[in-house]
């Protein structure tokens, strides 16, 4: 009571927020005569003037009123469309990083031109995000008339563009595209090997159309670029069968401290003999060599019932510190498969994620984010919690006069559909257009069959063909039209009423079920009553509908029985309407919790992703990587030193042979640790000796190659190593997330465990990147002095770009270097010809 009284006196918080923007709207309107007097050329030249003022210290907010007035005048001259005050308010909200709820037909597309133009003046780019290629192309081509008139460029990002076309589109002042393409381009850029081929600029400002669909409905499904993890699991089994022939200290050496094993020359020869391979170090056999090394490691360093157990025909890791089973965790780099082969259980063959990101985390990377939709208010709490976005309901240009009738509830679905069909026929005979909303395609087809039998002409909207969809929806307001569609279909296209339809009551919306979300129901209703047009809506429900059956069907059935409702008779009752709304609120709350939990888990991966991608971008763009390499050499030198250091012993008493072997393995160099050297040396001096010896070896290689070729080689090796280990890490993190909830940890939060173990795994990843990068760099042999040929991209898998089941886009990428010719570049990355390097 008190709250209602205060709202009547002071207005709602939304009304107050709108009122605060009114002075800006008044200023824009006051500027209109000034811009009307300018010639076309003078209007266009104003853009350069605005940019100059920005460069001289003014802000976008300082320019807002003039910029909006300019765009309004340009829109009128080019499209004969003038922004209403409601669109100005919407534009201001979008510029301020707020979600603007604008009802259907209120001109969201035109409203977006205002903040898009203003923010494009900074030169940092504006992305306007839509739900499909058709809308992206339509809106870009339509609105580009305004932008081009004002000397701004427009790009379009749609499916099937090549790298050069994408780069050009992103270089534009304003870029239209789909949420999927913007997200995939972010991932693609972080898999590139050449800085010149990077497409996206920084993520500056995004205006997301149908923001509720993209940031809420699609938030639970990540964008994934994947490729096959292995060609086949047979190689694991094949290498496992020959391991018994290998003898310790003859065919391989084991370093238990470093938990590593290495093949000797005799071991390599035996492997070649048993596997029927001429040269295990031939580039085409590197994969076989890797499998052989992992098989030896599995048999010699990992013990059953100590390091792992076999449970339900699966190899499960045992935590070495707690002794607990680490369900869901897998060893990386094929080691887990080698253990599976050793134990004779099924060897996992997985489609490996190469890169992934959720929409939640992708769009939070923009410096400024805003969005628009016809229905956002019911999800305002989620937008605030997840994205820190406020929602502003924009007043309609004309009052809403649509009549929303109470729901009709029947006992059975059969009765419900009979009544709905009868209503459709009745309205069709009257000439009033009807849009029938369903929650599933099969329901649409069932209603279509029933109407065909009654001889009622109608159109079924197929959401798979966006262009056809838009045309069908646009015609849904014609006299006598009957259109059947799923509730979500046809968004982005206004339904314009045909001649004489207003007099018949406008477009009638007939919903055949309530959706789990009130927002989706409101979207369906919102198709009618645009810009003050008449219209009506009603939902037909039954006690057999999922929502009612699962949430409170028994209670509603009892009410209907008490009221003595006969078969075929509907009920309209406020109590039942409230029960349905309560059911929807429960489901919405449940789905919100799922999405919140998803982002809590994905935030762990996102922090790691940002570190790796930032490091990768630095490697790609820095002109000099020598400092980075020297830092890695220093780190690894002192880590090796720490492995063998014993504060209670003089260095002469350390395991110097083991230390020498580890230095050899990491840096491919012999270090003099003879008694003459070590006798008068302390622990720190020995660490410095390892570091300086490795740095000197690095400088010698740099001198031999020359600085330019060294840079190219370093960049290639490091990018390839980062990508290879990162994809393994993604797989391991997936397994961790899947299995973390199955652990038997009493009273422990799975999320906390995931964060802790994920961090430990990430630390291990960073160390492995250093180790492998330096190991490869120091092992590359320079056969003779000749100019390095341009280093090519590494071999790529067949990539799969996936978001949801119906939008998988397979892009086969041709494998390179399946067979290496004598005059081809050596696959090891040295930049030399194969015949002068590994094939010598």
Swiss-Prot record:
Binding site for ATP: 87, 105-109, 494
Recorded GO CC terms: cell envelope Sec protein transport complex; cytosol; plasma membrane
Mode of membrane association: Peripheral membrane protein
Species assigned in the record: Desulforapulum autotrophicum (strain ATCC 43914 / DSM 3382 / VKM B-1955 / HRM2)
Protein name per UniProt: Protein translocase subunit SecA
EC code(s) of this entry: 7.4.2.8
Pfam families: P-loop_SecA (PF21090), SEC-C (PF02810), SecA_DEAD (PF07517), SecA_PP_bind (PF01043), SecA_SW (PF07516)
Function: Part of the Sec protein translocase complex. Interacts with the SecYEG preprotein conducting channel. Has a central role in coupling the hydrolysis of ATP to the transfer of proteins into and across the cell membrane, serving as an ATP-driven molecular motor driving the stepwise translocation of polypeptide chains across the membrane.
Family listed: Belongs to the SecA family.
SMART domains: SecA_DEAD, SecA_PP_bind
